[in-house]
Amino acid sequence: MFKFMIQCCCFSLLCIQAVSQHQTVKATGVFNGIYSEPLFLSTSKSDIEKTQFHYSFQSLYLKGKSSIRQTSTLKNQKMWKKLSNGSPGETNGQANKITAITPSIGNNFKGNELKTWTPTDNAIAISNGGIIVSCVNYGVEYYLSNGTPLLQNFTWNDFVNNALLDQGKFDPRVIYDNQHDRFIIVLLHGFSSTTSKILVCFSKTNNPMDGWNIYQMSGNPYQEGAWSDYPTIGVNNDELFINCNRFGNAPNYDFKKTFIYQIGLAEGYAGNALQYGLWNHIYTPDNQDGLTLCPASDGMGNSLSEKMYFVQMMPDSGSFVYLYELQGKLSSPNKTFTASQYAIPHFEVCANALQKDPSTGFLDSLSTGNAWVQNAFYLNNTIHFISDADIGNGWCGIQYGRIYLDSAKAVVTQFGDQGTDLAYPAIASFAHDISDAGVVIAYTQSDSTITPQCGVISVDDGMNWSSLQTVKTGDTVVNILYPPNYAIQPERWGDYTGICRKYNATQPEAWMGAAYGANTPPRLASYGTWIAQLISNEPASLLTTKQEEFSINMYPNPATDMFTLEFDNTQAGIVKVFLRNAEGKLVKLLLNDYLRVSKNTVMFNKLALPNGVYFVEIQMGDQQLISQKLIINH
C-alpha cells in the first residue's frame, strides 16, 4: 500500500468560505434485522403500454414540515424583514466572485406537468444508454435524450396499478445505478400510520419500458403510530439506502425521528425476496435528533464498496454540518454507524419567496421549505453537499459545501443577491476525473419581477462560481392554493429539484429536471417540468505557469528511503499535489485541501513505487503551477 504523510502548517478562511476541523466522532444508530420482504408486484412492458385510466389521488393537507424546530417562526420573522428592506426584485448589487465558466445548455424540452395541489418534487435520472426517467408528484415519464417521449402522462396509479395501494402517492425519488445499469424508484404511499408504505421499485432491465419489480416496505416499521415522509436515497456497489422522517398522525403530525432502510440490490433486480435492515435512534455528536440525512453516492458512478455517507444540516439554523458514516454490508456482523460534526459559519433558513402576477400586480409568496441538505455526493474522499440559506435580510441563496475527509475540514461558500430568491438547489459532479472537484447546480428562482423559473450555475475545482444562467423562464405565476377555498398561504414550491450526471459522457454532462410556472390544462397557473442537458465548458486542464506563487524543494532526488516535498505558497486557496508516471497517468493524489499562505511538507515511502521516472505536479484551482521530475531508484 502506498504510504504517505502530509504536514501543513496552517489553515484559514477564503472570503465567503470557511474552513474548520471536525469534532469528536461518535457512534450512533441501532440496527435491527436482517429481515425479508417478498416481491409485491411485477410489471411488464405490456402493462406499461396498455391504455391507462390515468387516475390520480392527492390530498391537500398541512404536514407542517416548517414547524420542525423553529423553522416557521424564523421564516415569518424574515418575511417582514425582507419586505421592509428595499423594493423586492431590485437587487442590491452584492458582488459574487464570478470566474468559473458557465455551462452550456444542450438538448432541452418540456417534461411532466403537475395537475395536483402538491409541489412538483422533481427527480430525474439518465442511463448510459440515454434514457431519461423524470418523476414528479403526479407521475412518471420516460424520454430519449433528444426529447422523444417513450411514456407520458403516466400517473403513479398507472405505474403501480394495484387496488391495495389506493392512497395518495407522493415524494418520488429516482436514481440510476451505474454499476448495474438499472433504475430505482422510491415512492411514498399514504399519510397515516395504517396506510404508510415505502414503494421500492427496481427496473428489470436498463430500459424502464420493460417493467419493474415493486416491493412495499412499511412506512411505520416501529409500530409507533407514525408514517414516513421526505425520502432521500443513495446506492453503493451492493445496497440501496433510504432515509425517511417519521411523523405522528393527524392533526398534530409530531416529529417521531428519522430512520434508514439498508436494502440489498441483487434481490431487487432479480425479483427475489428483499433482504433489508433498519437503523434507528440516530443522533448528532451534540445529541440532537438526526433529521433528513442525505446519502452521498459516488458522484461519478464509480465503485463504492461496503460504506455509505449521509449529510445533515438543521432545518432552521445552525453552525454545523453533520456527517454520518455507515461501514459494513448488510450481512456483516461488524457494521458500524458513526456521526461527526464540522463547524461552519452560522446559517439560517430564509424567508418565503415572492412572486407577482404581471396581469393583476398581486404579490404572492412561494414556500422555500427548510435549510436542510437538499442532496449530496461523494468523490475522491470529499463529500459535496448543497442547501439554500438566508444570504441577508431574508433572501434565499445557494449554500454549497465540501467536507474533506483526509484533513477533516469543511468548506462552505454561498451565492445569491438580495432582491431575488434562489431555492431548492440540486448538485451533481461536473468533474473530468476524480481529482476534479467541479460541480453543477440546478435551482429554482422567483421574485417580484419574474414568474417562477429555473436555471443552472456551476462551481469549479477552486470553488469559484460561474454566473447564473436561466434555463426556462416561467410562463405564469403559480396559484394552486387560491382563495376563497383556501386561506392565503405560501404556494407550495420544491420540495426538491432533480439532477443526475450522465456517467459515460466524454465531456462532463448532467441532466436537470426542475419546476417553472406553467399552465397545465385543465388547471391554470401551476407547474411544468423543464428537462435540460448541461454540458461543461471547462477544459480538462488549464496549464498556466505561475511558479512565482510557489517555491519548491524535493529531496533526496533520486529518492532513497523517504521522499520529502517542501513547498511554500504565497496565495491562499485549494491546492492539489499529484504524482504521475512518465506517461502522465495519475498514480496518487497526494493532497487536495485548502491551504493558507504557508510552508508545507509532503512525505511518502518511495518503496511503494517501482523504479522509474515520475512527475510531482502542484495545482491551485485549475492552474498547474509546478511540474517537477522525480526519479525512483531502489
Label each PLM-derived region with a short phrase.
Residues 1-2:
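N-terminal secretory signal peptides that target proteins for export/translocation
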Residues 5-8, 15-19, 545-555, 559-634:
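C-terminal outer-membrane/trafficking sorting elements
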Residues 7-10, 35, 56-58, 70, ...:
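Terminal low-complexity, poorly structured segments
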Residues 9-11, 16, 295, 351:
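Secreted/luminal cysteine- and crosslink-motif detector
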